[in-house]
Amino acid sequence: MATTKSFLILFFMILATTSSTCAKLEEMVTVLSIDGGGIKGIIPAIILEFLEGQLQEVDNNKDARLADYFDVIGGTSTGGLLTAMITTPNENNRPFAAAKDIVPFYFEHGPHIFNYSGSIFGPRYDGKYLLQVLQEKLGETRVHQALTEVAISSFDIKTNKPVIFTKSNLAKSPELDAKMYDICYSTAAAPIYFPPHHFVTHTSNGATYEFNLVDGGVATVGDPALLSLSVATRLAQEDPAFSSIKSLDYKQMLLLSLGTGTNSEFDKTYTAEEAAKWGPLRWMLAIQQMTNAASSYMTDYYISTVFQARHSQNNYLRVQENALTGTTTEMDDASEANMELLVQVGETLLKKPVSKDSPETYEEALKRFAKLLSNRKKLRANKASY
């Protein structure tokens, strides 16, 4: 309901915008959004590896990284982890992970992260290994050090409010300058699967500020694209580099949204007669599945409508597999066999058409995006040199 209300507000504000400003490529705001989905993060990781490879080829630069091309990178749950991996700096102030490093990360650490260690009275996994590996990989790096703007969501169960970690919020809310490993664990701490995460930071006057956080999907329902667009809109309004962009002018936004796959277009369907016999537990499981599937579809529908209303449908690309079956639908099956299947899903997805009405494949669409991102980066660099 909250997502629907937010969209309607955005939609009518956009329709009210009468700007006829032509899109200037060098001033376009580029946005990458990555869904949550546990081990299914392997699917968008395959897409990211392909896109980064295309950028390296187009610019003839093997050191090109995604963070060099996107103004905002947002993610929730496993998407938040991917966001951190490609934006957190190493000792050379470059992303500590290339896109090609992400799938091997899942294969190495996934079986340990999703190794049953809980109890029937608590979360399925104790989260200790996940937190440990995040600390090892991300170190003491904080939000302000991210190489581009980030938008990572979580939900505070003590204040009952979403918490959005972004660089642009730090001036007003310095307590949000948390360590990246705390943020990554928090956004991945899905109820039932991992324990909530408690940590503290400090306010501008030095007072202790505490967080009690769970999975960002509770705040963004798995798909952070609307959140990422909101952060990008604020960035466009506040950064002089985007001076020609009018408020909420989606003609000058380029959005790539990556999903982690859904069940065969609502593969698990039910009749009213069946559901009438369910108890509370059965309903809880079904509602979670229905909510995740519906929210992914509706967010895509909302955003598509907005971009079409501004005659900018080519500025938005949603990459999603809607026909997952068997073990690939599970967010915590980190067996080697299932992870290999997820790699195949991602590689096959690249060859599929973007829509039933378009012959363009995802691979072709991503190549088109890579050229746009490359040209825009060059134009901006030339403008900055004057």
From Swiss-Prot:
Protein localization: Vacuole
Coiled coil: 321-384
Keyword terms of this UniProt record: Coiled coil, Glycoprotein, Hydrolase, Lipid degradation, Lipid metabolism, Plant defense, Signal, Storage protein, Vacuole
Keyword Coiled coil: yes
GXGXXG, short sequence motif: residues: 36-41
PNPLA domain mapped to chain residues: 32-229
Chain span(s) of sequence motif GXSXG: 75-79
Enzyme Commission designation: 3.1.1.-
A GO MF term: monoacylglycerol lipase activity
Short sequence motif DGA/G: positions: 215-217
Signal peptide residues on this chain, from the entry's feature table: 1-23
GO CC annotation: vacuole
Coarse class of the protein's main subcellular location: other
Keyword rRNA-binding carried by entry: no
Domain of life: Eukaryota
Listed GO biological process terms: defense response; lipid catabolic process
Xref: InterPro entries: Acyl_Trfase/lysoPLipase, PNPLA_dom
Tissue specificity remark: Tuber.
Written domain comment of the UniProt record: The nitrogen atoms of the two glycine residues in the GGXR motif define the oxyanion hole, and stabilize the oxyanion that forms during the nucleophilic attack by the catalytic serine during substrate cleavage.
Remarks, miscellaneous: Patatin have a dual role as a somatic storage protein and as an enzyme involved in host resistance.
Role summary: Probable lipolytic acyl hydrolase (LAH), an activity which is thought to be involved in the response of tubers to pathogens.
Family membership noted in the UniProt record: Belongs to the patatin family.
Protein name according to UniProt: Patatin-06
Organism: Solanum tuberosum (Potato)
